[in-house]
Structures are given as structure tokens and as C-alpha cells.
């Protein structure tokens, strides 16, 4: 299994991914400043893929199909883009939203584009003893199975949060660059193997 790369197409670079596992990016959250004041009501009325309910949330929610994303557009000109599966897609989507706003007659720019959060996931393909892990790594772990089935591991370096499930599925969140996602996973992998459940 170790040589199965992304979608099994190319081999994994073991210098970068010694575990042989490359976390898949699931969601990118980015922000950009359109640098102009926006009339949200006008945008919601003119754009067909937009909804605006100011009583519920003070932003226009807009969606596009390609890349499949959702944007939150605020009257201040600030915008949040979520749902993209890569940094490039997130930037492309944000540019498309900016263009839609321009076409509606606002002098929208594209300032300070920034990736705010990268969410990745992977599967180590073996079950994990979460109680043992939580006990041994108490300073970084919170595990309360009555409240949430996963162990929450707050890594200090890089500053990343991992959700570790008994099944061996891992969610990695908090990265601003994808290498932090990869580094965090490689840091935790030896710990996971140490607390591997012996299957009866």
C-alpha cells in the first residue's frame, strides 16, 4: 500500500512522506479583500447564485459550481471562500466571485488573498487505542468519548489540531500551508503505530 500515491497515479515521495501516506486536502478556507463597500441587497437581487438573509447572517452567501465552493461576502468588501480542494482552486474561485461582483457594477479589487485554514484527512488503515494515547500524551490530548468519538490532539509544532478516530481515520486542521498538514501527520504517525490496537 505504501507506494499508492494520489489516486494511485504516482509513487509517494518517501523523503517527504516517510509513512508512505499522503493526507488528502478536503477543504481550503481563504479570505480576500475586494477593497470596496458593497450593497448586499443589490448583489442578492442581481446574482442568481446568491442568498441573503440579514436577520440570520450579515453576509451574502454565494455558490459556484466550478471550483465547487461557497463564498461569504460582507458589506465591508471582505470575502471568505470555502470548499475548494486545493490552494490554486481556492484562489481561482475567489477570483471568480470577485469578477461576479465587478460585473454587478462594484469596483472590486483583489487584495490580500490569504489561505486561512487547510483541512486534510487520511486513513492509517489500523485501529488505534485512544485511551492509551490520551494518557501518554495528556498535555496535548483531550478525549471524552461521551461528548465526541475522536481524540483531539493539539500539536505545538507545527501548531495543528488532529482529530484521531479509533478506526484509524485522521482529520488534520489548522494549517496555513499544506506542508504543515504533511509535517503534522508525519509527526503523529509513529505515535499512532505505538498505540496500534492488536486485532483479535
UniProtKB/Swiss-Prot annotation:
InterPro entries: TBP, TBP_CS, TBP_dom_sf, TBP_eukaryotic. Its main location: nucleus. Keywords: DNA-binding, Nucleus, Repeat, Transcription. One of its GO terms (biological process) is DNA-templated transcription initiation. SUPFAM superfamilies: TATA-box binding protein-like. The keyword Repeat applies. It comes from the Eukaryota. Sequence repeats lie at residues 25-101, 115-192. GO terms for molecular function: DNA binding; RNA polymerase II general transcription initiation factor activity. Belongs to the TFIID complex together with the TBP-associated factors (TAFs). Binds DNA as monomer. Belongs to the TBP family. General transcription factor that functions at the core of the DNA-binding multiprotein factor TFIID. Binding of TFIID to the TATA box is the initial transcriptional step of the pre-initiation complex (PIC), playing a role in the activation of eukaryotic genes transcribed by RNA polymerase II. This is TATA-box-binding protein. It comes from Solanum tuberosum (Potato). The gene is TBP.
Amino acid at each position: 500500500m505504501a507506494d499508492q500515491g494520489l489516486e494511485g497515479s504516482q509513487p509517494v515521495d518517501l523523503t517527504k512522506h516517510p509513512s508512505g501516506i499522503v493526507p488528502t486536502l478536503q477543504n481550503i478556507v481563504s479570505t480576500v479583500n475586494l477593497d470596496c463597500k458593497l450593497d448586499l441587497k443589490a448583489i442578492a437581487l442581481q446574482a442568481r447564485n446568491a442568498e441573503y438573509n440579514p436577520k440570520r447572517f450579515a453576509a451574502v452567501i454565494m455558490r459556484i459550481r466550478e471550483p465547487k465552493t461557497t463564498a461569504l461576502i460582507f458589506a465591508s468588501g471582505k470575502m471568505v471562500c470555502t470548499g475548494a480542494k486545493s490552494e490554486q482552486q481556492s484562489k481561482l474561485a475567489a477570483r471568480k466571485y470577485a469578477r461576479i461582483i465587478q460585473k454587478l457594477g462594484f469596483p472590486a479589487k483583489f487584495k490580500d488573498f490569504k489561505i486561512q485554514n487547510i483541512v486534510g484527512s487520511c486513513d492509517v488503515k489500523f485501529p488505534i487505542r485512544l485511551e492509551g494515547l490520551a494518557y501518554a500524551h495528556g498535555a496535548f490530548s483531550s478525549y471524552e468519548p461521551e461528548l465526541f468519538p475522536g481524540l483531539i490532539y493539539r500539536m505545538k509544532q507545527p501548531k495543528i489540531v488532529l482529530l484521531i478516530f479509533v478506526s484509524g481515520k485522521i482529520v488534520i486542521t489548522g494549517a496555513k500551508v499544506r506542508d504543515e498538514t504533511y509535517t503534522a501527520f508525519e509527526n503523529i504517525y509513529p505515535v499512532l503505530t505505538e498505540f496500534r490496537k492488536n486485532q483479535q
